[in-house]
UniProtKB/Swiss-Prot annotation:
InterPro entries: Na/H_antiporter_dom_sf, NhaA. Na(+)/H(+) antiporter that extrudes sodium in exchange for external protons. It catalyses: Na(+)(in) + 2 H(+)(out) = Na(+)(out) + 2 H(+)(in). It is a multi-pass membrane protein. Its main location: membrane. GO terms for biological process: regulation of pH. Coiled coil: none annotated. The chain crosses the membrane at residues 11-31, 47-67, 88-108, 116-136, 145-165, 170-190, 261-283, 299-319, 327-347, 353-373. It comes from Geobacter sulfurreducens (strain ATCC 51573 / DSM 12127 / PCA). The lineage of its organism: Bacteria, Pseudomonadati, Thermodesulfobacteriota, Desulfuromonadia, Geobacterales. GO terms for cellular component: plasma membrane. This is Na(+)/H(+) antiporter NhaA.
């Protein structure tokens, strides 16, 4: 049974299933679908609120764990010199889509679509990792390279959400951010007292951070991003991204171990709450988001990867021009975070639905990447 569960998680089945159910429901019974996700059902909270503002706290918390571990000595982003090329590629993978989006928006869009520039900046780590292993094989250095830039990419994505996408319906009230700072202080004190349980950090520190962000009209889903780095962890990281170290029983590792499976299966709810858009929603925002993810990511990562090499920071062995281009293409899968940003970037339902459709269609990059990898005879390393 455990093997089957891990297989479902590995292939992102819960997320994909949630997306499919949402699409079918929203197109067959749109009134019923929107009533389900928008009507209050528990303590005045809607299903959409519970998923996007409460469940996603755990999703971004797990992302913060990966970033924290990668930055520790021995981690994939430490020392900085060995991570320079992936970080430059990350920069290209963020700036490239933004430039493509804004450039195309000036041609086929309009001022009302400008706020969507942040949608194509982040990569869906889990789906990109899956597709990369199918294209390159699990042992290919390009897979690790992609994971590094995807994690750094998500860190930038979190910052973009926090800074550039406050609640458009309410002015930001920065005074409440002192509560978020108080949550960080609590987490620091707990660590100083050598508290080994992650519950006080998450409940007290995370609760204060969530309340501060919510009252400030920012995105409370980011609450644990400010708390996770304070969880006790080893002085040195011994495992790579997505690798479990059975010897690591630190508070940080236990939080990830206990909640990652909840997040993986909970993504069914995320897909259900966010992917319900009508097929008629296809519009200018759809093509802006899709083109920015596919073209912007590919060109940006390819260009900056070679800039890094020219500056003396080499690409991994066995990663040449076609492997780097394929890595950029796979990084264009922006499903999860792109859906989230589309939901906060646009208030108008038609534009939001159109942008979300672009994020959903980016999942089709997986098929293109697998076929192109075979056509280009990309060498697979099991």
């Amino acid at each position: 049974m455990r093997k089957r569960i891990n297989l479902l998680r590995e292939f992102s089945v819960p997320l994909i299933a949630g997306v499919v159910v949402a699409l079918l429901w929203a197109n067959l019974d749109p009134a019923g679908y929107h009533s389900f996700i928008e009507q209050p059902f528990f303590g005045g909270m809607s299903f959409h609120f519970v998923v996007n503002e409460l469940f996603m706290v755990l999703f971004f918390g797990i992302a913060a764990v990966e970033i924290t571990q990668s930055c520790l000595p021995g981690g994939d982003l430490n020392p900085l010199r060995k991570a320079v090329n992936p970080l430059l590629a990350t920069l290209g993978g963020v700036v490239g889509p933004v430039l493509v989006y804004l450039g195309l928006n000036a041609i086929i869009g309009g001022p009302e679509l400008t706020r969507g520039w942040g949608i194509p900046t982040a990569t869906d780590i889990a789906l990109a990792w899956l597709v990369a292993r199918l294209v390159f094989g699990a042992g290919h250095p390009a897979v690790s390279f992609l994971l590094l830039l995807a994690v750094a990419d998500d860190a930038i994505g979190l910052a973009i959400i926090a800074v550039f996408y406050p609640d458009p319906n309410h002015p930001t009230e920065p005074i409440w951010l002192f509560l978020t700072v108080a949550g960080m202080v609590v987490a620091y004190i707990l660590r100083s007292l050598k508290s080994r349980s992650y519950w006080p950090y998450v409940v007290v520190g995370g609760g204060l951070a969530w309340t501060g962000l919510f009252k400030a009209h920012l995105h409370p889903a980011l609450a644990l991003v400010f708390i996770i780095p304070f969880l006790p962890h080893p002085s040195r990281e011994t495992a790579h991204l997505f690798e479990a170290d059975p010897r690591d029983t630190s508070t940080l590792a236990r939080f990830e171990h206990d909640w990652k499976i909840v997040v993986d299966f909970g993504l069914f709810m995320f897909g259900l709450a966010n992917a319900g858009v009508g097929f008629s929603s296809v519009g200018a925002a759809t093509w802006l988001v899709l083109a920015s993810l596919v073209i912007g990511k590919t060109l940006g990562i390819f260009a900056m990867g070679y800039v890094g090499r020219a500056l003396g920071f080499p690409l991994p062995q066995q990663v040449g021009a076609k492997e780097l281009a394929m890595t950029g293409l796979v990084a264009g899968i922006g499903l999860t975070v792109a859906l989230f940003v589309a939901g906060v970037a646009f208030v108008e339902p038609d534009i939001q639905g159109s942008a979300k459709m672009g994020a959903l269609l980016s999942g089709g990059v997986s098929i293109v990447a697998i076929m192109l990898g075979r056509a280009l005879n990309v060498r697979r390393i099991p």
